[in-house]
Amino acid sequence: MVEILLSGIVLGLIPITILGLLMAAYFQYQRSKAAS
């Protein structure tokens, strides 16, 4: 039961983490492009 709960949490967090990293990289790219 605990394993199922943990795997569900991990599977839910992975896409959110990837999305957050992509958004952070995108905003950083937009800022550097606007600054130059």
From Swiss-Prot:
**Keywords, comma-separated and alphabetical:** Chloroplast, Electron transport, Membrane, Photosynthesis, Plastid, Thylakoid, Transmembrane, Transmembrane helix, Transport
Q: Name one GO biological process term.
A: cytochrome complex assembly
Q: Which Pfam family is one of this chain's hits?
A: PetG
The membrane topology term of the UniProt record is: Single-pass membrane protein
Among InterPro entries, the record links this protein to: Cyt_6/f_cplx_su5, Cyt_6/f_cplx_su5_sf
Give the signal peptide range: none
One MF term in the entry's GO annotations:
electron transporter, transferring electrons within cytochrome b6/f complex of photosystem II activity
One GO cellular component, as annotated: chloroplast thylakoid membrane
Could you tell me where this protein is found in the cell?
Plastid, Chloroplast thylakoid membrane
Transmembrane ranges, per UniProt, are 5-25
Self-association and partners? The 4 large subunits of the cytochrome b6-f complex are cytochrome b6, subunit IV (17 kDa polypeptide, PetD), cytochrome f and the Rieske protein, while the 4 small subunits are PetG, PetL, PetM and PetN. The complex functions as a dimer.
Family stated for the protein in its record: Belongs to the PetG family.
Q: Which HAMAP family match?
A: Cytb6_f_PetG
Quote the protein name from its UniProt record: Cytochrome b6-f complex subunit 5
